[in-house]
Amino acid sequence: VLKRAEEEIRFIEDHGIRPLFYQDEDYPQRLSHCDDSPIMLYYKGNADLNADRVVAIVGTRNITDYGKANCEQLVKDLSDDNVLVVSGLAYGVDAVAHRSSVKYGIPTVGVMGCGMQTVYPSDNRDLAEEMLQNGGLLTECMSGSQPDRENFPRRNRIIAGMSDAVVVVESALKGGSLITAEL
């Protein structure tokens, strides 16, 4: 156990990751009010996780052209406000929300369902790098944690818990987006 802890500390230090503990000033305060908030988060980036307004934008991975246009317009409309956009760095709505935030200069944070060593899906690796310039990446998963199915509902509770509002751009009748909105 001690060896694993030493490896984790080394990984954090080598990759510029900040551990945020539940009572730290930089820990997302909205999330700290949730009964199931994580004791610790791993954060890499420069966005204020306690911005005046935090808006989660979520939705289907299979976004339509109509959904893309609506998502981009929503983000553009938020660009005049002091807002942080949060999403899950997945395909579809999440990626459009993050890309649009980068485009309009809005801080955006991707909450991941795996450790910081992996960007999932890997197609979003370049997007994740861009987000580090004005935003960041956040996870409760230790290094080495893979993007396993059970991690995504836990990720979704962080997205909802740290946000003032959850906007579902486009979704199937059943799925993670509507579950996130209900949280």
Language-model features, listed with the residues they occupy:
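Glycine-biased, small-residue-rich flexible motifs in mid-sequence functional cores and linkers
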Residues: 13-183
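Long amphipathic alpha-helical segments
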Residues: 1-12
